[in-house]
Design a protein with these regions (language model features):
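NAD(P)+-binding Rossmann beta1-loop-alpha1 motif at the extreme N-terminus of oxidoreductases
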Residues: 2-66, 70-73, 79, 101-105, ...
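C-terminal amphipathic alpha-helical interaction region
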Residues: 409, 417-493
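Glycine/threonine-rich flexible loop motifs
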Residues: 82-97
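Rossmann-fold dinucleotide-binding core
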Residues: 11, 91-95, 109, 115-227, ...
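Small-residue-rich helix-loop
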Residues: 232, 355-388
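Interdomain hinge/lid region at the active-site interface
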Residues: 191, 216, 221-224, 228, ...
Length: 493
């Protein structure tokens, strides 16, 4: 034993909001000795450490500190310090406070929802100073932090053997006992993967909401009936955390005895990671339409006043048609399942493109398995996704894997019917229809993009390729007879 580490703790944690508290308790419950620190801001954050140590952490191997130097000194070398603070400048400020007290080889772990580009920069900065930095995406919310989350670490690879025992011990375990925490890759890859996870989460939630909305407005099902349908779906291929909680929500009553879901205002908030996933997909030149739709629908939902005004100007006239409820529920199932597969396929395609662009060498099968427990998008078909990516002949696209190709063929008829009927009844299903249009575009050998490129060449001399020439040769047409032969350089519209 290193005598310098005698009576030292195994890990330090900074930031005692609920996520930080729960992670510290989780670590202590797994046998680790933990030092905790929280800033003191007069009139804003006072007595945070004392309340935690004497409250929820009482009797556990958790030591509290209000002095950052004493906190750092209390941790065994090489120090492992997990930061659970608000993403952005707060992380940078905290790092600057820590640097003077660290020793060479110490490890900082950012467990917040940081932008992966910030993590890229922080890894480089820490390593330049002789330290190590891990950007670890943590999914699972308050419950996951306490009982086991999905943790996605990336950054300084030499830090992994040091932090692996602790992080894997507090991570959720999949049904086969595998920890939902594996090394992702270098730089900001861990936070990038968490960002795409959150984007898929946005898509999942929008799709489930649309399924609920069609049941309610097209079929006229009551809350109990809808809850039963979601509960039944959770016993099959749609089994997942989000379907599970959706089965509970319609039946939940408030203190007055009424159904709470019917009293919740139809405006959905967002914190930004869904938007980040869409922006980064665009920068990588990858379609992420379903998730973009989910993000934009939250934005539109927030414009409640505008929607109320518009609803009085354009009255939706729904027919009095009586639908075969059992058959229509099957169609809703098909639309939900198929669209979810599209959402995951789009997300994993972005991960693959990022892996290639940034030389991260991401293991998509490992990522799929990592999401099987603890995280918000955990679902049974992630096993099938992992299997597809582990195949000897790895598919170019998830939906082209034999298993998913067969699933999509079985689901397509009901999916099409559901979207068509919803449009006929003037019932918005933007994510279902976005997914269906993406699928049709994906399986189309030809698209109308030739017209777009002709237009670009007409007004901007952006050139085009020809179907009767080899790929890679570019041509410009003098469309008007007086435009000249000069081609566009780097100018793009």
């Amino acid at each position: 034993m290193n005598m310098k580490n005698l009576n030292k703790t195994d890990i330090g944690l900074i930031g005692l909001a609920v996520m930080g508290e729960n992670l510290a308790l989780n670590m202590a419950d797994k046998g680790w000795n933990v030092s905790v620190y929280n800033r003191t801001v007069p009139g804003v954050e006072e007595g945070v450490v004392e309340r935690f140590v004497n409250g929820r952490a009482k009797g556990k191997k958790i030591e509290g500190y209000t002095d950052i130097a004493e906190f750092v000194t209390s941790i065994a070398i090489p120090r492992k310090i997990m930061m659970m603070v608000r993403a952005g400048s707060a992380v940078d400020e905290l790092m600057e406070q820590l640097f003077p007290h660290l020793s060479e080889g110490d490890i900082l772990i950012d467990g917040g929802n940081s932008n992966y580009e910030d993590t890229n920069r922080r890894v480089a900065l820490a390593e330049k100073k002789g330290f190590r930095f891990v950007g670890a995406g943590v999914s699972g919310g308050e419950e996951g932090a306490l009982n086991g989350a999905s943790i996605m670490p990336g950054g300084s690879e030499s830090a992994w053997p040091e932090v692996k025992p602790i992080l894997q011990s507090i991570a959720a375990k999949a049904s086969d006992g595998t920890p939902c925490c594996q090394w992702i890759g270098p730089a900001g890859s861990g936070h990038f993967v968490k960002m795409i996870h959150n984007g898929i989460e946005y898509g999942d939630m929008q799709l489930i909401a649309e399924a609920y909305w069609v049941m309610k407005n097209l079929l006229g099902l009551d809350n109990g009936q809808m809850a039963e349908i979601f509960a039944d779906w959770n016993e099959g291929k749609l089994r997942s955390y989000l379907i599970e909680i959706t089965a509970n929500i319609p039946r939940h009553k408030d203190k007055s005895g009424g159904y709470l879901i019917d009293k919740i205002l139809d405006t959905a908030g967002q914190k930004g990671t869904g938007k980040w996933s869409v922006i980064n997909a665009m920068e990588l030149g990858m379609p992420l339409g379903l998730i973009a739709t989910a993000v934009f629908e939250r934005s539109l939902s927030a414009q409640k006043g505008l929607r109320e005004t518009a609803s009085k100007q354009f009255v939706c006239r729904r027919s009095q048609a009586v639908y075969n409820k059992s058959e229509m529920v099957k169609d809703i199932y098909s639309a939900l399942y198929a669209s979810k597969l599209v959402s995951y396929a789009q997300g994993f395609a972005v991960l693959q493109r990022a892996s290639d662009a940034f030389a991260w060498n991401l293991d998509l099968a490992s990522i799929a398995r990592m999401w099987r427990g603890g995280c918000i998008i955990r679902s049974i078909f992630l096993n099938d996704i992992a299997t597809a990516f582990e195949a000897k002949d790895k598919p170019k696209h998830l939906l082209l894997a034999p298993y998913f190709k067969n699933e999509m063929q079985l689901l397509l008829s009901g999916w099409k019917h559901l979207v068509a009927q919803s449009m006929k009844e003037e019932l918005p299903v933007p994510a279902f229809s976005s997914a269906l249009n993406y699928f049709y575009s994906l399986v189309s050998a030809k698209l109308p993009a030739n017209m777009i490129q002709a237009q670009r060449d007409y007004f901007g001399a952006h050139t085009f390729e020809r179907t009767d020439e080899l790929r890679g040769q570019f041509f410009h047409e003098n469309w008007t007879g007086h435009g000249g032969d000069t081609k566009s350089g780097t100018y793009n519209v």
